């Protein structure tokens, strides 16, 4: 007679960590029978499921000014709080391109209440961290601090975006800092290639311009340009105050009303419209045979954040995956493209990407190759794309679904990435999508869905290409374009 036994040893401290239902836990024995320990028993697997999904609630409140306050209280002793603003380089024109990024640099250079030194000392004495970044569609200012210092952190953030002095001396000093930053960016070939990719994919549109702006703009941006950008775009309906960690939503709401109130008034008239950005299949080539490796990105037009096909394209992106020589492996790699790349020694590394904006996006792959293998690597990539459109299998899609869910959950580790997730989703969807809903949408993707959606956006579509380095062997654009479909007899 087969016997199954399960032994569970828990310290008293471990028992206390079992949420508050510590008297009941279900375990499966080796023979499949249910084993219980504790005084109370879980009566059904449904009860267990309810416990697993018992994640902190994301609470959202909209103030009269349009400012949205969103938070998740996880009971930690630290927190992250920040302002997510629907304003980035996409809202600029050719003359003021670079203003949003310039403002990010000026944020910590002093306000009407605090000098730059006072601001730095106050943050350091709190043991906090203050940071900011600019993207093509968003500008973000955030602070990481102890939960008890949440009121001071919110007050500092409010002071920064409402009362920055924008002194002429600081502006002149920051020009040099940004120009040096531009030089550093130009040494990062991946960033260079992606800027070129946007420039060719979105020609003569706002998304085609860089975030830092051209050198001539950085040298000429004035205080008036900065003030005009703030008064035009830093308005209540386009700002989210997000927080995560040990935060009380009611306290955060009171702080928002006190420090922002009616100061972030709504727009006079309509909110500035987002300029449309048309995708153009095209290429940029910067040949330099002195460089040791070729850097190449190829992409097709994808969809915006809220489009129904976004999830499916994310799964397809995970299917292609990424690979680096340091990974090792071989034919046992889960990604088919990684198997072919490793077996044929076709490149040093590759990574797939799915970059989404409000109404458009780029879905593609970035690779680093030897000059002699550029053509072969690109051919294998396009062949794998065609396979996604025609013959991807259910087992591959199941693996990609699980990997995507795992990666998304692993990213939500700590108050800062959770706060980032809240702020970004509030701007993109005007709500935070619950994890169970997101998992259900991912699980709904199957091989047939992948084939349909990839055929819609990849098959026989004109790609955008950006290539830098020794790219003599790179096929011409007509040949690359013809490989975006399979011709059958």
Swiss-Prot record:
Binds 1 zinc ion per subunit. It catalyses: Release of N-terminal transit peptides from precursor proteins imported into the mitochondrion, typically with Arg in position P2. Changing residue 422 to T: In MMDS6; small decrease in protein level; impaired frataxin/FXN processing, leading to the accumulation of an intermediate form, called iFXN. Pfam families: Peptidase_M16, Peptidase_M16_C. Keywords: Disease variant, Hydrolase, Metal-binding, Metalloprotease, Mitochondrion, Neurodegeneration, Protease, Transit peptide, Zinc. Belongs to the peptidase M16 family. One of its GO terms (biological process) is mitochondrial calcium ion transmembrane transport. The gene is PMPCB. Gene3D superfamilies: Metalloenzyme, LuxS/M16 peptidase-like (3.30.830.10). Binding to PMPCA is required for catalytic activity. The lineage of its organism: Eukaryota, Metazoa, Chordata, Craniata, Vertebrata. SUPFAM superfamilies: LuxS/MPP-like metallohydrolase. Residues 1-43 form a transit peptide. GO terms for cellular component: mitochondrial matrix; mitochondrial processing peptidase complex; mitochondrion. This is Mitochondrial-processing peptidase subunit beta. It is linked to Multiple mitochondrial dysfunctions syndrome 6: An autosomal recessive, neurodegenerative disorder characterized by basal ganglia lesions, cerebellar atrophy, and neurologic regression in the first year of life. Common features include truncal hypotonia, lack of independent ambulation, poor speech, intellectual disability, and motor abnormalities, such as ataxia, dystonia, and spasticity. Its EC number is 3.4.24.64. It is found in: Mitochondrion matrix. InterPro entries: Metalloenz_LuxS/M16, MPP/UQCRC_Complex, Pept_M16_N, Pept_M16_Zn_BS, Peptidase_M16_C. Zn(2+) binds at residues 101, 105, 181. The active site is at 104 (proton acceptor). Its cofactor is Zn(2+). PANTHER family: METALLOPROTEASE, MITOCHONDRIAL-PROCESSING PEPTIDASE SUBUNIT BETA.
